[in-house]
């Protein structure tokens, strides 16, 4: 099953997350199918903290990919900020 979830990057104490479409059996930071965005929880004022490719997100959901709870929250937050 394909899931859309966060893959952690960055360095110690400075997290950065890629939002990726991956097989559910893959490790958290392992192989993924496609990167559909990023989330930077420590973004400074004026920096972009969240970017999502809405078209690719819609495609993956259309073919049956499940969102992780955190990604679902971020998608909702991103839609609210865009409106």
From Swiss-Prot:
Pfam families named among the record's database cross-references: Ribosomal_S16
Entry superkingdom: Bacteria
GO MF annotations in UniProt: structural constituent of ribosome
GO CC terms, sorted: cytoplasm; small ribosomal subunit
Statement: the UniProt record of this protein carries the keyword Ribosomal protein: yes
Keywords: Ribonucleoprotein, Ribosomal protein
GO biological process, one term: translation
Family classification: Belongs to the bacterial ribosomal protein bS16 family.
Alphabetized HAMAP family for the sequence: Ribosomal_bS16 (MF_00385)
Name of the protein this chain belongs to: Small ribosomal subunit protein bS16
Source species of the chain: Cupriavidus taiwanensis (strain DSM 17343 / BCRC 17206 / CCUG 44338 / CIP 107171 / LMG 19424 / R1) (Ralstonia taiwanensis (strain LMG 19424))
């Amino acid at each position: 099953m394909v899931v859309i979830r966060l893959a952690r990057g960055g360095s110690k104490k400075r997290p950065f997350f890629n939002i990726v479409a991956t097989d559910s059996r893959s490790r958290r930071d392992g192989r993924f199918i496609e990167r559909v965005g990023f989330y930077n929880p420590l973004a400074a004022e004026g920096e972009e903290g969240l970017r999502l490719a809405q078209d690719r997100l819609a495609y993956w959901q259309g073919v049956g990919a499940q969102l992780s709870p955190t990604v679902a929250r971020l998608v909702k937050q991103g839609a609210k900020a865009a409106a």
